[in-house]
């Protein structure tokens, strides 16, 4: 009886405390030293802002242990503006409730600008992984970049130069970029929109989307799909198991699309001539006997489209190949 009475009073006390907590201590969104504790980082003011000036084409190097990296072109010549956003998440419960455990760097060496956040020592707090440091950086158009994050997304918009991007699990978005790009993500998607140059991309678990590209595309995927539209240039794809869909406006040096188990569908411009090779579980070629000459059965195709010339190779072990002539 004593045990039952004790449990009864304990339950009543817990309910009272819960009501008091809700009434007297509603959620608080504090603002201290430029940091919002609101869980929505979009509404935050920057924790720190720094500006630099570069003379001519510059180079930007960014690293963060956890958070997003956004690099955006702006119209001010030579100006580089860095905004650092801090989201503490649940870190106020842990040993990392202040920023003393992190080394924040923003500096300039000639025409190179460096922005980084690193841990001074490994924090073992229960919620230490919830703390994120995100960069939003405004740069002139002529700017090469080296962008890395262990746990966030990367976006690059409107710049020209040589670019390297790496994230351990986030997405990578590349818009209106010219030059040479190398992008890698361990688990996210990669997208290209209105790009011009040489584009290398690899994802271990996501898809790759391309919308209007001029130049050379080299794409590698573990199991994701490729969706490519309005391509002018050269394209090489290696996928372990995903589908490949590609529409070409013009073809330069050639096309090679390879997937182990997925399907391939390609739209080729009728004004070009191609040396075409395809192997698949089943092949579908648009019925145009005047443009194709060579050998063809349900699983293999070898011949020319039009007058021939540009090599096109389409290979899948277990999927289908569909070839459309526009």
Sequence positions of predicted segments:
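Intrinsically disordered, low-complexity terminal regions
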Residues: 1-326
